[in-house]
Each structure stands twice: as structure tokens, then as C-alpha cells.
A protein has these predicted regions:
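Mixed-charge (Asp/Glu-Lys/Arg
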Residues: 1-91, 96-175
């Protein structure tokens, strides 16, 4: 996702530079240049706004591993040390994160269109002792079933749903 933003920014910058130098070269005057640069800037802003899907749509279009990688970027931006586990045989955790104090969290990432149920809570609860973590989280772009909430509480598993995830991403300026 970051590469896509960089490419768009580079393309917009290159387009603006060509416009600036082309206008000056053909007119040898800065007045039309200022007008054209302003117009080009407005057009680029509008195009990027229209062509860039919202964070919600981006999340919903991601595949499972892509969602895990996006979460890794999000938690790195928030200051955590992040390790992605293997795509298969991950023993219930997709990411292992650690804060600046050394507090370790196992994360089970679920990119679902339906509500996340018991299985995700069971997976991350099992991964906490396996990886030597302090806590387990299940993070989703969706919601959780009531049964997931009931199982999470006694197992000290934190559930982060779509609303909380989007708020955190926006706070980290990843929208």
C-alpha cells in the first residue's frame, strides 16, 4: 500500500514538474505558469481523491496475507517491533508484536466479510504460551460473534473490530 502511494505521489510530482517547465519554456513568463500550476494542482488533488479508494474499501478488497502485511505496517507505524509469522503453520498467530517496554502480543488477523467466531479466539489463546507472549489479540475488518466475546474475556484475549481498527489506522494517519 505504501508503494502505491509513493508511485502516485511520484507520478503527480513528475506531471507537475513537466507542466511547470513546459509552461515557462513556451511562454518565458511566470504569470501563466502560476495559473497553470494552480489548475494542475487542483486537478491532481481531485483525481487522486476520486481514484484512491477509502480505507474501508481497501480493507475489504485485501486478501488474508495482504491484510496481515497491512497490519504489520500499521503496528510498525505505531512504534511496535513486528514479526510476521509464516503464512501456513503459524500456530495461531499471524503477527507477533512487542512494545517499547518489552510487552509481547500475539495477533490473529481475520479479514472476513462475516462476523469472526470462536475459532479465532481459540487460535490466538493457544498461540500466547506457544510463542511466549503476554497477551493475545484478534484483529478483524469485520465484527465478532457474541460467542467470541464470551470466550475472549476469560482467556484475556482482546478483540479489535472494524470500528476500532479504522479509528486506530486513522489515528496513525494510514488512510
Amino acid at each position: 500500500m505504501k508503494r502505491l502511494k509513493r508511485k502516485r505521489l511520484l507520478l503527480a510530482t513528475l506531471f507537475a514538474m513537466v507542466g511547470i517547465f513546459g509552461t515557462y519554456f513556451f511562454s518565458s513568463s511566470w504569470e501563466p505558469l502560476i495559473l497553470i500550476v494552480s489548475i494542475v494542482g487542483c486537478i491532481l488533488f481531485l483525481l487522486l481523491s476520486i481514484l484512491t479508494p477509502s480505507l474501508e474499501k481497501q480493507l475489504d478488497r485485501m486478501e488474508g496475507r495482504e491484510f496481515e502485511e497491512w497490519l504489520a505496517d500499521l503496528f510498525e507505524t505505531a512504534g511496535y517491533r513486528v514479526e510476521l509469522t509464516p503464512a501456513s503453520r503459524d500456530f495461531g498467530a499471524d503477527l507477533l508484536i512487542e512494545d517499547e517496554r518489552g510487552y509481547k502480543i500475539a495477533i490473529q488477523a481475520k479479514r472476513y466479510s462475516a462476523a469472526v467466531g470462536l475459532e479465532a479466539v481459540q487460535q490466538v489463546a493457544a498461540s500466547v504460551p506457544f510463542y511466549g507472549m503476554d497477551e493475545g489479540w484478534v484483529v478483524t475488518n469485520s465484527t465478532f460473534t457474541e460467542a467470541a466475546y464470551q470466550l475472549a474475556e476469560p482467556n484475556q484475549v482482546r478483540l479489535i473490530d472494524r470500528e476500532e481498527l479504522l479509528a486506530f489506522a486513522k489515528e496513525m494517519n494510514l488512510h
